[in-house]
């Protein structure tokens, strides 16, 4: 699924910030 993958990417960005 692309949705969970997108959320994972956003989560990684949030942790980076």
Curated annotation (Swiss-Prot):
Cellular component GO terms, alphabetical: extracellular region
Tissue: Expressed by the skin glands.
Localization in the cell: Secreted
Keywords annotated in UniProt: Amidation, Amphibian defense peptide, Antimicrobial, Secreted
Residues recorded as bearing Phenylalanine amide in the entry: 17
GO biological process, one term: defense response
Domain of life: Eukaryota
Chief location bin: secreted
Keyword Secreted belongs to the record: yes
Sequence similarity: Belongs to the frog skin active peptide (FSAP) family. Phylloseptin subfamily.
Protein function: Has antimicrobial activity.
Protein name: Phyllospetin-H4
The organism of origin for this protein: Pithecopus hypochondrialis
Gene designation per UniProt: psn6
